[in-house]
UniProtKB/Swiss-Prot annotation, chain A:
It is found in: Secreted, Extracellular space, Extracellular matrix; Secreted. The gene is wnt8a. Disulfide bonds join C55-C66, C105-C113, C115-C133, C181-C195, C183-C190, C260-C298, C276-C291, C295-C337, C313-C328, C315-C325, C320-C321. Palmitoleoylation is required for efficient binding to frizzled receptors. Depalmitoleoylation leads to Wnt signaling pathway inhibition. Proteolytic processing by tiki1 and tiki2 promotes oxidation and formation of large disulfide-bond oligomers, leading to inactivation of wnt8. It comes from Danio rerio (Zebrafish). This is Protein Wnt-8a. Ligand for members of the frizzled family of seven transmembrane receptors. Required for mesoderm and neural ectoderm patterning during gastrulation. Involved in axis formation during embryonic development, via activation of canonical Wnt/CTNNB1 signaling. May be involved in the specification of the spatial patterns of expression of Gsc and other regulatory genes leading to the establishment of the embryonic axis.
From Swiss-Prot, chain B:
One of its GO terms (cellular component) is plasma membrane. The keyword tRNA processing does not apply. The lineage of its organism: Eukaryota, Metazoa, Chordata, Craniata, Vertebrata. Receptor for Wnt proteins. Following binding, activates the canonical Wnt/beta-catenin signaling pathway. Also activates wnt non-canonical signaling. In neurons, activation of the Wnt pathway promotes formation of synapses. May be involved in transduction and intercellular transmission of polarity information during tissue morphogenesis and/or in differentiated tissues. Plays a role in early eye development, possibly through wnt non-canonical signaling. As a receptor for wnt11, promotes eye formation, at least partially, by antagonizing the Wnt/beta-catenin pathway. It comes from Danio rerio (Zebrafish). PANTHER family: FRIZZLED, FRIZZLED-5. The chain crosses the membrane at residues 249-269, 281-301, 328-348, 371-391, 415-435, 462-482, 513-533. This is Frizzled-5.
Amino acid sequence: MNPCQIFASLVMSICCHILSSTAWSVNNFLMTGPKAYLAYTSSVQAGAQSGIEECKHQFAWDRWNCPESALQLSTHKGLRSATRETAFVHAISAAGVMYTLTKNCSMGDFENCGCDDSKIGKMGGRGWVWGGCSDNVNFGDRIAKLFVDALENGHDSRAAVNLHNNEAGRLAVKATLKRTCKCHGLSGSCSIQTCWMQLADFRDIGSYLKIKHDQARKLEMDKIRMRAGNSADNRGAIADTFSAVARTELIFMEDSPDYCVKNLSMGLHGTEGRECLQSGKNLSQWERRSCRRLCHECGLKVEERRIETVSSCNCKFHWCCTVKCETCTQTVTRYFCAKRHRNRRPHNHSRKRQHTRRG
Amino acid sequence: MRKPADEHHFTMETSGMHLVGFWLHVLLLFQLSGLGDSASKDIVCEPITVPMCKGIGYNHTYMPNQFNHDNQDEVGLEVHQFWPLVRIHCSPDLLFFLCSMYTPICLQDYKKPLPPCRSVCERAKRGCSPLMIQYGFEWPERMSCEQLPMLGDTDRLCMDRNSSETTTLSPPFPKPTPKGTPRHRATAKSAPPQKCDRECHCRGPLVPIKKEAHPLHNRVNTGSLPNCALPCHQPYFSQDERTFTTFWIGLWSVLCFVSTFTTVATFLIDMERFKYPERPIIFLAACYLFVSLGYIVRLLAGHERVACEGTGDQQHILYDTTGPALCTLVFLLIYFFGMASSIWWVVLSFTWFLAAGMKWGNEAIAGYSQYFHLAAWLVPSVKSIAVLALSSVDGDPVAGICYVGNQSLEGLRGFVLAPLVVYLFTGSLFLLAGFVSLFRIRSVIKQGGTKTDKLEKLMIRIGLFTVLYTVPATIVVACLVYEQHYRPSWERALACSCPSERQRLGMGPDYAVFMLKYFMCLVVGITSGVWIWSGKTLESWRRFIARYVPCRTRKPPVSASSMYSEASTALTARAGTAPTGTYHKSAPSSHV
């Protein structure tokens, strides 16, 4: 469903572009518009998809776990929410699109763009110079802005918030760029190095934005001026409010609902039936407390289920050169949130439970 | 509301010419979507095309590798630089190690990294690193073995032929050809670069004392290792440095001998000429004569015969010994007379202080000469006897002499460093006091007229000589301080590290410091010769020769010479009534 939704959005975006043109002829559009724009469509689509997957990973152990409904950026049903989580979705989607466009540009997938050679040959530091293929983030930023911001055609504060969060996502890609070097020298020595700027792992960008999500700020619009609607006064109020927020920070306008409870009208499924983590090595503190956060604090209990899994184990390298692994069947214990059953039919049982509660 | 309007508008617009364009876009979108799907960015296995790495056991690799090489052409350019090393067969594992790093193995059914094991890297490094060091290269840091997984690590798999359960022949290296040569090389190099383990043990060039019957058993340790002796020669210095040491010591000791011999001979033929306070210079020169003789004995007998014991691989430096005659002889000559020369320098500064500062006459100072001799000869005697009694004589692995403190820090500090510091300090005090007094009474001397010019010049000459002595003495003390401070770490490094590491970290003694020490030990003897450089020396020798030949017939001239000598000693150039007057004047000063 996700690709179809985004695909539909993209198609509508392109059609709107066509409709908005007044002096376009069919020949001109086919010669320039389609080639220039259709070349990026698959990258935009793949980038948005990677953003969705990263969102699911970053919020895997949160009450709000990036459900499908949150990914319908423009829907005809109901009102679009402007919560903290929505801000993250906008940012990670924009980052994903920009990331994929930039990477495909460096890979030579597009004819009209290539490496960022603005620093080629310049002295970077002691013992290293700029060279190689620096990722062209400016190109990715420009095209991503063109595509993603086109989905916002309103002028109200909600649209302004979304555009701001889109930009924050793109800035996250720039903020996580890292310098990578290659050694040159006789017999493997590193007497001189050539360095270039390279995109970080997309996971790093997701983690970066997750921190921004936790630090997001709520906008307090002047309610009186908001009544003006889509008037000049409203736009002035929006401009005044946004000038005080850094471009790298996420912002939202509405408080988040209770994600413990199922609310199908808002596309929320609640935490019942969700899996959580109890124990295990290499678990972070956030993961270790996921059962408390998802189950206990939502009024549910933790239910154990034993599941058999088949995996490769005892891999060994055999000279030369193969790796042979055994197939192992393991019983692993997984934990899920379940409702607490309260049966009041037997009178005696009811009394007994009350007694337990008192104690 | 807006969107329904848009939809309506869209429906109206699509009718007509735009309809064809719309479907064309959709068609292109689907096509591009398909293209996008096919362009996946996962690891792609590709056949190995680097000629050097074909046939190493696997055929597929992936790019970029860990060195950020984008394609195999780039890999080939860099890895081919190692071809000479591979060709020379310094290690049978080098080729596989290099290729597994530069063209990493790519398996379709195993996606985790599969680097070579640490053992493969260490075998290649052990075989080839010494050869690389000979040509000025170090083992590349980015191929360090510590970052590779260990064989048998379950979390990180790695490649090594030893992990194979079934014994299979390695295709790149057939058994007979490489095993012979590498083994021979390994055998040849087994001792020096014993794979650079950091465990402390009595390794070469240290000499282990294994037999209990050995006289040094349980009596000697190096770097806190028991039953471990230092070799005959300083292990930190190369053969060229050792040869130069012999030349260096020989040069200065011969020069010292010639200079001091001349001085002593001149004194013996004309003893009246050198009176106090300058007479200690003669005795100081005599001491240096015997010190240089000690070094010359070492040169004639050789390093091994004087300072070492044992034969072949078991030859080691002498420890705590009193037995060998050559060793004891060299020790006595250098130590006894060296210390005596220091005390004579103190006596010189003291007598100079009496003459220049306290205005004593030479007769008054000479009256105490027996005490000066007692101190100058008795104190070194007591110390030398103590060293011999304590069996503290040991060999010097650098100079090849026998001395005290070469293998014992307590001996070095107690018998060498402490006395030298005391002598240097005491003599400097006398010099300082003398100069202060000299400046104070300068005006009084000048009031005496031209008669005081010679006296003042003599005082300044003696003072200058005495002050200049402090320079080499201070340098010797500094060298000894440096040596006693760092020697434990030098010995520990011999036991706990390997030669290449020691050479790289520079954890050995400074060769120049030792050469400076031996030069400064002998330079005073050389410079003491300048004392006799004057016309008087020629006159003394001429008179000596004339007096020797016609002994009988010239008794009156002898008397005349003695009279003239007295006049000369009185520092006056006039004859006749002047000598009598001068003598008369000096009597009151000596009385005072």
